[in-house]
Structures are given as C-alpha cells and as structure tokens.
Amino acid sequence: MKISVAVPLVLLFAFAAIVHSQTAQPPARPAWAWKPALPAANDGQVHVLPVRGRVSMLVGAGGNITVSSGSDGLLVVDTGTTAMSDKVLAAIKSISPRGVIRYVVNTDERDDFTGGNEKIALAGNTIRFRVATDPRVSDALAKDRASIISFVSVLERMSAPTGQKSKHPEDAWPDDTYSSAQKKLYFNDEPVLVMHVPSTTDGNSIVHFRLDDVVSVGDLVDMTSYPYIDLKAGGSINQVLDGLNRLLEITVPDTKTEFGTLVIPGRGRLLDQSDVAYYREMIGIIRDRIQDGIKRGQTLAQIKAEKPTLDYDPRFGHTTGGWTTDMFIEAAYRSLGGK
C-alpha cells in the first residue's frame, strides 16, 4: 500500500515542476534578482555589534565605527557624523564604562567618518610618554584629549592650509599623521597596523588588529553603494582595485569554519574574505566595461547608455541621494582618462 501511494505523489510533484518550468519566465538580466537587507541602522540610534575579541562595531552613526577595548583603554576608528557624536560616546561607554579613549584613527576625511572627531577626542586622553611641556609633544599630549591619527593628506584637507577657512574645528584635526606605508601601534596587548591604502582618495587608511584578525577599511568597501570616488582628493577606480587587492593579501579564509579574517566596511554588514573577493570582482568587471568603451572612443553618455553597472544595480545602485550610479560611472570614466 505504501508503494502505491508514493508513486502518484512523485508523479504529481514531477508534473508540477514541468508546468512551473514551462510557465516561468526567467529574467534575461541582471544576475542579482534580490536586494539583501543590510544591518545598517536607520532608526536614529547607535548599535553595538561585538565582532571578535577586543573589537566591536558601531552601526547607525553615518559610517561604521570600530572600537578596540582593553587594558590600555579604547581605540576608535572613525567617529561618525557630528549630529550623532553624543550617541556614539554613549555607545562607546557601554562597551567599557571605565575605559579611556586613547586614540582616534580617521580612515579618510569624509564628514560621516570625521564628524565626531572633536567631541570624541576631547572626551579622551592619550597616554603620555613625555611631559606636556616638552616642545616635541603633539597637541593631544599637551591637552587632555585623545590623539587623532591619519595619513598626512587627511590633515591637509581638513585644516585647509591653502588659506581657505576650514569647516572643521581645530580640535577635530588629526595631530598624529604619518606619510609612510604604515604606522604601527601596540595597543590592548596586540599589534595594530594603520596602513596607507589609497582608494577613493589619495589618503585612505585601513586598520588591521592583528591578534583579533579584524580589519577596519572605511570607504575602501561600501556594501550599500558603489565606491565614492573623490577625484579632487586623488581617488580613482584603479586605486580602489589596488586597495581591494591589498586587502585580499592580508585577509585569510578559515576553511574549517564560516569566517577567518573579518572585515568592517565603511557602511553595511560585517564581511569575510569571500565578500571582499566578490566586491573586488564587481569593481573589476565594471572598470573593464568602462575602459573598453573608452578604447572604442565612446563618450560618457554612450557608456552610461550601455549601463555597465546593470548586473549590480539592484544591490549597489542608487538613482537619488548624494552618490548615484551615474555619478560613480562618471567618476570611474574620468579617472580612466575619459574626456
């Protein structure tokens, strides 16, 4: 009896599958038919997400913020927008109520990464290695504030040294800059590397917490949009690709588990190496399409008409807001030598 019942059920499911395959119309393009929900908070609150070991991620203050908490105090990578700085401070204190903010690292100078610099730095206090009256000490060591670290060009743009009035208060400026390939710290019992990785500007940094194996990358990876390439600040699509290749060199997958090196992007969800590889391939494909159009003598309008980003627009594209798909295509086109 069991066999006689099972056979009709199998036939029924097979028939249903045949009917479905005959009636369903598969989309010709794009490859992404869905837009995954990203855990970026839009509720006006700052949310704390534990990442690994000493490292946590703050979401909801503009760009993502990274916090290392331990015996030396707190190191904060990027500070969100000015409007959210009080809530960012409260979130940091929830991680370590007695922890002192010792360092702030800016991955670039964009307002949603540096807007909270002043308030967060003034709430901290850098560890002093020399007396405050020593003329060699930085501003942060002479004052009761956390030191702000960045690549030197970030300070140059934030301080407006060409004679223009800076829109950033002086206490928000980086006071501990570097101009070499990297700056090394030993903080909270682990090596921390601040590395110069030009991408969307000429002054981007990424921060590698080596023992916890977490990398905070700022604008190098944005899981909510195409890269914000700032041509005036020395950014280019080729630099973004070079930066992503550099990131892939220092990330390691764990074949036995789901993770390995974890990556905190400038916006969007927490990533692993496979996510970065996908993002790199996407940028490479789009770059090649635009470059091919330039080689064939196409204008910017003609390249836009061919929609070189179409496959990825459901996930990363925007038609409104401060950074649209058209703006990204134009920035990539100009950075590749298009006229």
Question: Can you annotate each of these PLM segments?
Answer:
Residues 48, 71-75, 83-136, 146:
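Active-site metal-binding motif and surrounding structural segment of the metallo-beta-lactamase
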Residues 46-99, 206-209, 213-219:
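Conserved beta-strand hairpin/beta-sheet module of binuclear metal-dependent hydrolase folds
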Residues 54, 68, 78, 92, ...:
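Divalent metal-coordination and catalytic microenvironments
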Residues 73-74, 81-83, 95, 135-203, 210-211, 243-246, 251, ...:
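Metallo-beta-lactamase
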Residues 7-18:
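Bacterial N-terminal signal peptides
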Residues 1-6:
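Positively charged n-region of N-terminal signal peptides that target proteins for export
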Residues 12, 22-38, 126-129, 133-135, ...:
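Accessory terminal helices/loops
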